[in-house]
Every structure is written in C-alpha cells, then in structure tokens.
C-alpha cells in the first residue's frame, strides 16, 4: 500500500512536469509566430513554472534511495 502511494506521487509529479514542458513549448511557439498577445504568453510561462515547481516537490517527496535503504535494513 505504501509503495502504491509513492508511485502515485511520482506519476503525478512527472505528469505535472510534462504539462509544464508542454505549456512552455507552446508559449515559445506562440512567440516565434509573432502573436499580438504577449500577456497570454507570459501567463502560459507562469503556469508552466508553477506546475514544474509543484511537480518537482511531488517527485522529491519520496526519495527512492530512502525506500531502498528501508528494504536493506529489513
């Protein structure tokens, strides 16, 4: 049960990082086409930054070395 919880946090963190990457890539492609809305691009950049910070915190919540160390102690 604990391993399933750890995998859920890791999957959620990775999916948020992928979402942030998609948002930032979309913002860069909007800027390269010379859109007239610079505010929309900055909103996408801030949303990507927030999602990436949350994803990194979720990924770092459970460290895989800690899990391996607990298994070795048993």
From Swiss-Prot:
Cellular component GO terms held in the UniProt record: plasma membrane
Keyword Transport: no
Superkingdom field: Bacteria
Membrane spanning residue stretches: 11-31, 40-60
Protein's membrane topology: Multi-pass membrane protein
This protein's UniProt keywords: Cell inner membrane, Cell membrane, Membrane, Transmembrane, Transmembrane helix
Protein location: Cell inner membrane
Principal place of residence: membrane
Family from the record: Belongs to the PceB family.
Function: May act as a membrane anchor for the tetrachloroethene reductive dehalogenase PceA.
Name this protein carries in UniProt: Probable tetrachloroethene reductive dehalogenase membrane anchor protein
Naturally occurring in which organism (per UniProt): Sulfurospirillum multivorans
